[in-house]
């Protein structure tokens, strides 16, 4: 793997749009927002974004009805088996 195949950044993901959903779906939708935001900014498909459990725990920390308004994640993009993959973990 060459250095051009690896990229790591700390990204702030806005989750305010999750409040447009019904209260029973907000945390679920917030996880989808994180996955979509990282896929867009790292130029990969949403299926190629792997979220660490720490991201899930941070979204669900206040319960299903009240996800945080924004979330900072440390994301790394690299090539695995010829396909670009993004792995993300919660950045405190």
Residue ranges and their predicted role:
Residues 2-92:
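Compact, Lys/Arg-rich rRNA/RNP-binding cores from ribosome-related proteins
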